[in-house]
């Protein structure tokens, strides 16, 4: 199953919500046609995060006896934050959420893959493998991208 899975902005932190609005292109240029053509606000994406999490939990809880794969755009863990960005708490809230508890409570999730970051990650949270293998911007960065990466779900 999958969804965009916007982040929770550091657990809905007011300072993060305010700061990312001015720092991210998503909130300067994007319009939300559902609300009458206006700029997208961090509060909008936090609400979409909540909706996606509710959907994920519903589907996962209905399928406890099946192996599941989750695909989301934004990262489910701060473990997917590259070392050079770890000190930027506010901006990291716009890229990563801490969904470790949700993942640990649902061991049927065998693989969770995501994007939104420009560096590769492959690690475990409990019984769940978290994988991100982005190419990044062509000719601009060394992301660790593996064009032949295959992930086997057991």
Regions found by a protein language model. Give the residues of each.
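Active-site metal-binding loops of divalent metal-dependent hydrolases
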Residues: 3-5, 74, 115-118, 135-137
């Amino acid at each position: 199953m999958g969804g965009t899975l916007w982040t929770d902005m550091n657990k809905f932190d007011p300072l993060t919500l305010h700061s990312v609005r001015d720092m991210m292109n998503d909130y300067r240029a994007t319009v939300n046609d559902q609300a009458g053509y206006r700029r997208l606000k961090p509060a909008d994406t936090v609400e979409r995060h909540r909706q996606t999490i509710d959907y994920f939990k519903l589907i996962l809880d209905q399928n406890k006896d099946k192996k599941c794969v989750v695909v989301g755009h934004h990262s489910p863990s701060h473990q997917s934050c590259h070392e050079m960005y770890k000190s930027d708490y506010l901006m990291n809230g716009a890229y990563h959420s801490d969904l470790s508890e949700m993942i640990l409570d649902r061991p049927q999730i065998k693989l969770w893959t995501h994007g939104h970051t420009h560096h590769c990650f492959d690690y475990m949270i409990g019984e769940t493998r978290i994988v991100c293998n982005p190419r990044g911007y062509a000719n601009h960065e060394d992301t660790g991208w593996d064009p032949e990466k295959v992930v086997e779900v057991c």
